[in-house]
A protein has these predicted regions:
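Long, aromatic- and glycine/proline-rich binding clefts that accommodate carbohydrate-like moieties
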Residues: 307, 312, 362-415, 419, ...
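Conserved N-terminal structural module of periplasmic/extracytoplasmic solute-binding proteins
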Residues: 2-117, 133, 139, 318, ...
Length: 448
């Protein structure tokens, strides 16, 4: 997720809670870098306030407050005022409505996967990359896999804050006993480098733990099956081109191959079969399983249960490195006549927040601003540093208006995949059902 059940379907129930009106309307001030709620994005002030809308409550919200405080020396005379909104459809609906009427905040946090539904419609304004460069933020500071998704018609419509990939967590004890760790104590990726090896590793983990091997929570979830499927499918090198009007250009045989593998991972023998999101978390926290397939946004939960919990990028099972992910990014809601000096202030504030990314990294998110991940301080973060390389191989949702975090598209794909994983549909039938649903989405006109 972030979006991290917080962000993220990611972003799920363990990290995002419905916010009360009071929380959305007000928060504590942080001195010169004040954090507060606001009733109106355009309320009068002396021009020193940069208003930010974001979906971060709970632990992530606290970390963003810390980032604002840490960033203050790099944005003197500026205060950041946050308004926290419920993540998901309510957040994006309110952002779209406010932007269309020119009443949005100065800056907002959006999932990168939703950009294709916003940038082409005129709801967002592009960033001034020359201005960002004045404050030390350059295109080369970001991984190609992430930065490439910020572009539309040759302009930059998002500035990435993080990458939040779908990875693997493991308990070091049974992983070591199963012979699945390297000499330096990290996960042996080669042991998971094909479907057969992955399944064999799951059996070894089950033997070593005396319980079960790998947990994956997906039942009734609106995104989990899609995350696992799309990352694996992109590892096959198969086409997934979605042109407006359709039909979808995909490799049905490779789709079926991936679905077949997914079903074997949760076949109910060495790995649990019918786990929902919360049950998968519980099975790993309680050490009923030795490994879990999960978003990095659950690091806090897992580390609270096992301070030595290990993590690694999702293994390359089908030949080509690819890790499903999304990215929290800063976007500029459209203004018909933006104040140039205030836009400069907004650019400076975002640059300052990016440079304070070490704070954000403590939650498990990979800072998108790579000068942060190259520091000695970041290298000391474990297990974060062990999966940071995932940022170089991330794949986001297809760049189409109907896809992205919290979308009906993810839910529709996940519902079909769930039927296959529960044994109610063959992999081939599931693949073809997904294609039919893809074509239905493609037949709908883009709002742009």
């Amino acid at each position: 997720m972030t979006g991290t059940p917080a962000q993220v379907g990611r972003h799920g129930p363990t990290r995002r809670r419905v916010l009360t009106t009071a929380l959305a309307a007000g928060a504590a001030a942080l001195g010169a870098g004040a954090l507060s709620g606001c009733g109106s994005a355009l309320a009068a002030d002396d021009g020193s306030t940069v208003r930010l809308w974001d979906p971060f409550s709970g632990a992530d919200g606290g970390l963003l407050n810390e980032m604002v405080a840490k960033a203050q020396p790099d944005m003197p005379g500026t205060r950041v005022e946050r308004t926290v909104l419920e993540w998901g459809t309510p957040f994006y609906t309110k952002l779209a409505m406010a932007s269309s009427g020119g009443r949005g905040p100065d800056v907002a946090v959006s999932h990168m996967s939703r950009l294709a539904g916003y940038a082409p419609t005129g709801l967002l304004d592009p960033w001034d990359t020359d201005l960002l460069a004045e404050y030390g933020i350059a295109r080369d500071d970001f991984a190609d896999a992430v930065w490439s998704r910020t572009q539309f018609d040759g302009q930059t419509y998002a500035v990435p804050l993080d990458t939040h990939p779908f990875i693997v967590f493991y308990h070091p004890g049974p992983a070591k006993k199963a012979g699945l760790l390297t000499a330096d104590g990290t996960l042996d990726a080669d042991a998971f480098s094909s479907p057969d090896r992955f399944l064999a590793a799951g059996k070894e983990l089950a033997k070593a733990s005396g319980k079960q091997g790998i947990a994956f929570g997906y039942v009734t979830d609106t995104a989990q099956c899609w995350r696992l499927f799309y990352g694996l499918y992109r590892q096959t090198g198969g086409r997934f081109e979605l042109r407006e009007g359709g039909p979808a250009e995909v490799d049905v045989d490779r789709m079926a191959e991936v679905i077949s593998f997914m079903a074997k991972v949760v076949d109910g023998t060495v790995n649990p079969k019918h786990l929902d999101y919360a049950s998968a978390i519980a099975s790993f926290v309680n050490k009923q399983t030795a490994m879990t397939l999960s978003g990095e946004w659950e690091l806090g939960t897992y580390r609270a249960a096992d301070k030595n919990v290990g993590a690694a990028p999702f293994p390359t099972v089908f030949g080509t490195p690819a890790v499903y992910a999304d990215s929290h990014s800063f976007v500029l809601p459209h203004r018909d006549h933006p104040d140039e000096e205030h836009r400069r202030r907004t650019h400076r504030a975002v640059a300052a927040l990016l440079k304070a990314g070490q704070v954000w990294a403590t939650a498990g998110h990979i800072p998108a601003y790579q000068p942060v991940t190259r520091t000695t301080a970041y290298a000391r973060l474990e297990p974060q540093a062990h999966y940071a390389q995932a940022a170089s191989h991330v794949v986001l949702d297809p760049s189409v208006w109907f896809a992205g975090a919290g979308s009906d598209f993810q839910n529709a794909m996940s519902q079909v995949l769930q039927q296959a994983l529960l044994g109610d549909m063959t992999p081939d039938r599931a693949a073809r059902a997904m294609v039919r649903r893809l074509n239905t989405f493609l037949s709908k006109p883009s709002p742009a």
